[in-house]
From Swiss-Prot:
Transmembrane segments: none annotated. GO terms for cellular component: extracellular region. This is Putative BPIFA4P protein. Expressed in breast cancer and salivary gland.
Length: 179
């Protein structure tokens, strides 16, 4: 009788385990789908607009002396006309990694777009950009005793943005911006 009971418990455990994995897989895919749709509904992709580089680049040249004093005004005038426009922004498949013992998870959001760089004296060129955004979320208890999601560390992975211009096989045209 003990052997039959033990076998029954073992079979029930295996059945529950496999059923739980199927349910978790379904919930996980539904959660990721809902998360992706929520990010798209947040309407942040169309809010990416033309960016002027005048202020950041001008402040970078403020303390520089020497040759830049000679070439500074023409270069600064050219910088004032630089603009970058983000086109065709897309979210790729969002993934989530959880740590149940610490009540937190990490959401990874792959992002791609085209950058159109316009200079006054040159024809505009297009660069393809790809980056992964990693956001830490955790479950916290609020003052009223209810649990809510809190967003923690948000960073780019792998601490870089890949930008490529021209032919994809030309490695000299790849740029890597470290953050």
């Amino acid at each position: 009788m003990l052997n039959v009971s033990g076998l029954f418990v073992l079979l029930c455990g295996l059945l529950v385990s496999s059923s739980a994995q199927e349910v978790l897989a379904g919930v996980s895919s539904q959660l990721l789908n809902d998360l992706t749709q929520g990010l798209l509904r947040a309407d942040f992709l169309p809010s990416l607009q033309t960016t002027g580089l005048q202020k950041p680049l001008s402040s970078a040249f403020d303390g520089v002396s020497g040759l830049l004093d000679i070439f500074g005004p023409p270069l600064t005038n050219e910088i004032n006309t630089v603009s970058i426009q983000v086109k065709n922004p897309q979210l790729l498949h969002v993934s989530i990694e959880s740590t149940p013992q610490r009540k937190e998870a990490t959401v990874q959001v792959p992002f791609t777009s085209e950058l159109i760089v316009q200079l006054l004296t040159m024809k505009p060129f297009t660069a393809n950009m790809q980056s992964d955004i990693k956001v830490q979320i955790r479950l916290e208890k609020n003052v009223g005793g209810r649990y809510e999601l809190a967003f923690g560390n948000c960073r780019l992975l792998p601490e870089a943005i890949w930008i490529q211009t021209g032919v994809q096989l030309a490695p000299a045209q790849n740029l890597l911006w470290q953050t």
